[in-house]
UniProtKB/Swiss-Prot annotation:
Pathway: Amino-acid biosynthesis; L-threonine biosynthesis; L-threonine from L-aspartate: step 5/5. It catalyses: O-phospho-L-homoserine + H2O = L-threonine + phosphate. One of its GO terms (molecular function) is threonine synthase activity. Its EC number is 4.2.3.1. This is Threonine synthase.
Length: 405
């Protein structure tokens, strides 16, 4: 097991605390896949409790006693029959990551990231966040007894997420700027070795997130979807999920790979614009804006990995408007009973748009990833809903309303 630069190929020991290569390239974790292949099988995996740590051989942990867990993973994969009829498609699933302990997919990364911090003997961890990362890191820091500092863009974080980070006991700092400004600041703290950085620039955190791919295959009885649609903000998740599918293929668990499709908000779509030009590099947005706060990121750190995932898989990238996001959020709630935050609904909005554009075949088996629970941002849901009806204690009025249902 080692760290390898995706740009120049230089390798580093796994115990070296480094976030990017000397050349500036992003790092990824590489394993002895032949050794994993000898150790795992579908049958062996199935005998273990479902969750992130079911797939231990694929995770960068040397000492199991150092694992920090809140029973993350094992999230439901819903067959969405009502949405299939609504959208006119054959087979649709939603992988609901809002069912994780702190309500988002970030918990998968943090269980591995904070475990790694444990192995390294780190005492102080930190991150910049649009909300979910801070909530998750704060929870896992509390679980492990570590000190935690999180930087958030002032006034740009949904209250549900802010409340979590504060209540778990992290030192919460609000920065007068955007997410990218906050990230620059924590990266400097990490450079000066004042914190162990657990944003998705840290390759160990992404190792936990790749287990989404493992679970999808597991829950589909080792079948592979034709396409996986992922909301894209800092771009770590789509990269991690693609890596998970590839590692299952390398080790003989599956023999096909899905098309990875990334969805960004129209006000923060540097990866989509790069994809349209078939470019390898993005042009950052200086002032990203969208109702989907979790993906309101103008300069995604993992853009090179995300674009590689999209290009290598024959996938696609598309942007959706705030109006399309809200419509999809309502559609998912009212047709399937799944309540997600706005950023999560971008995967459904993107599916709908790409079906209308003829990019996605209606016979495909599709999995949409929803990344966070609706209670993360209840204000957005309330703003998008009708006002509750107010009445006196009058049964006649109540029955009249009942007839109008």
């Amino acid at each position: 097991m080692l760290q390898r630069c995706i740009k120049c190929g230089k390798t580093y020991d796994v115990d070296e605390i480094i976030y990017t290569c000397e050349c500036g390239g992003l790092l990824e974790i590489i394993y002895d896949y032949e050794e994993i292949k000898d150790k795992v099988s579908e049958e062996k995996l199935r005998k273990r409790e479902i969750g992130v740590w079911r797939y231990l051989e694929y995770l960068p942990v040397k000492d199991e006693s150092k694992i920090v867990s809140l029973c993350e993973g094992g999230t439901p994969l819903y067959r969405c029959n009502n949405l299939e009829k609504e959208l006119g498609i054959k087979e649709l699933y939603v992988k609901n990551e809002g069912a994780n302990p702190t309500g988002s997919f970030k918990d998968r990364g943090m269980t591995v990231g904070v475990t790694r911090a444990n192995e390294l003997g780190v005492e102080v961890v930190g991150c910049a966040s649009t909300g979910n990362t801070s909530a998750s890191l704060a929870a896992y820091s509390a679980r492990s007894g570590k000190k935690c500092i999180v930087l958030l863009p002032e006034g740009k974080v949904a209250l549900g997420k802010l409340a979590q980070a504060m209540f778990y006991g992290a030192k919460v700092i609000q920065v007068k700027g955007n997410f990218d400004d906050a990230l620059d600041m924590v990266k400097q703290l990490a450079k000066e070795k004042l914190i162990y950085l657990l944003n998705s620039i840290n390759p160990f955190r992404l190792e936990g997130q790749k287990t989404i791919a493992f679970e999808i295959c597991d829950q589909l009885n080792w079948q592979v979807p034709d396409r996986v649609i992922v909301p894209v903000g800092n771009a770590g998740n789509i990269s991690a999920i693609w890596k998970g599918f590839k590692e299952f293929e390398i080790t003989g668990i599956i023999d096909e790979l899905p098309k990875m499709t990334g969805i960004q908000a129209d006000g923060a779509k540097p990866i989509v614009e790069a994809f349209r030009k078939r470019a390898k590099d993005i042009i950052p947005y200086k002032n990203p804006e969208t109702i989907a706060t979790a993906i309101r990121i103008g300069n995604p750190v993992n853009a090179p990995k995300a674009l590689d995932a999209i290009y290598s898989s024959g996938g696609y990238a598309e942007a959706v408007t705030d109006e399309e996001i809200v419509e999809a959020q309502k559609l998912l709630a009212r047709k399937e009973g799944i309540f997600v935050e706005p950023a999560s609904a971008s995967s459904i909005a993107g599916l709908k748009k790409l079906l209308e554009e003829g990019i996605i075949d209606r016979d495909e088996r599709i999995v949409c990833i929803t990344t966070g629970h609706g209670l993360k941002d209840p204000d957005a849901a309330i703003r998008a809903s009708e006002e509750p009806i107010k009445i006196e204690c009058d049964m006649n009025v109540l029955k009249r309303i009942l007839k109008e249902l």
